[in-house]
Amino acid sequence: MTIEHAADAAPAGERSLAEMLCAARDEYGVEIRLARGGAQAAENYSRRIDRLVMRIYAAASSQAGTPVALLAIGGYGRRHLCLHSDIDLMILFGGPIAAAEERFVKALLHPLWDLGFDVGHQVRQLSELAQAETDNPGFLVAVGDSRFLTGDAGVFERFDTLVHGPESVWRQPTVEALFGLVAERHRHFNATIYQLEPDVKEAPGALRDVAAIRTFVALTQPGTARSVPATS
């Protein structure tokens, strides 16, 4: 058995990864049909996917030779997954990335690909984050919505201080990147065709703007992001 498929070898009495995913999607569908609220259903589904990802991590973790933390970023970080959303991950190593770490990354990602997920993944060494990646606005904004999934809590705490701490050099570049991406999207989706048939996700005032507002509040007023209501 190859290491990338070891995660799906369920112990006796446990569900396979495919069964876990199928059950998560079925439960999401039930919640939507019962009209329990889209935001809550998305959060519940995201938590179920968390458990699946954590299981894959647990099977792969012995491959890494240096401490590693796994983070959810972007929409997955906000727990806004829909049934067929991609999942955005940051694989953050506390030390050098060598052959063992590359094997770990493969062992983590291959089972997700095999399940049909579109995985957006960023691999970083903690020392690389001493400066904000100002040439990568999408990454800056995605990291603004990061949360810890599993792995080395110490690596995550150092990351959190670097990126979200009171003296972080990431905050202002991230705010600027957020404004730039919003303006670019508004220019595109404010065209006449979208006035006739608005895009409920991308258009001005639509779902991406709600997410942008929450991200902005989290960046500029830490601890108050939950005061901005989620959509339902």
Language-model-derived ranges and their functions:
Residues 1-232:
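A nucleotide- and high-energy phosphate-metabolite-utilizing enzyme signature
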